[in-house]
Amino acid sequence: MRTRANRANKIAVSLKPVIFCDFDGTITQLDVTDEILAQLAHPSWREVEQEWACGSIGSRECLERQMALVEASAAELNGLIDAVPIDPHFSRFLRLVDVRRLPFYVLSDGFDYVIRRVLKRAGINGYLQNGTHLFASALRVEGRRLLTSFPHSASPCAHGCATCKAEIMRRLSAGRHPMVFIGDGLSDRFAVQEADVVFAKRQLLTYCREKGVTCYPFETFAEVETALKELLPFERLQKKGEDSINQRSRVKS
């Protein structure tokens, strides 16, 4: 496992890290999939969850079996999704990412239908809605059944993931860019093995501490934004460049 010093060195030599972010419980303040299951699924979903938690099955099989236990109309599902709060600091963090032109991707075992609806309600559109920067499981509603598919589950995936975050990270960074990962759950544990800088909370933070994975604890995206500004020299370099341009403009005027 790479040390914090090695990670910091890799970040320091690059002006364009790639940022990868989980969705459920990270961008949102609670796990939307768990809420759907808790409110709309047969109680036996918890037994399937336990199989996944102890490592007997991967997240793809887990979600496939669990969502088959859900019975709900589109209206019921949408009503639940629309009540999910997101991190109040996420929009500001995303503006920083956009201004600095940092590649940003959402990687989730959760479902595209849910993610797009939550982000749209929060006024977040553009590239996170169009599919090029969103990698998630697929969901569609037919009657009172929820049908799933897994377009980003690598074949073969040694861990049986619904979305193979590690493989996507390797492919998108192409070995040329340092990788930042932001997450909160056990489904993120394989992604942190690829990342150069990790921001973790809840179960992922516990996992990182138990496994000796260097990480930065956080509760909100305000903390992630502050830490990134301190870690990444591009922030200071960019600011100096802007100040220099502004100064030249004042002299000319």
Residue ranges of predicted features:
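Alpha-helical substrate-recognition element adjacent to the catalytic core
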Residues: 2-123, 133-138
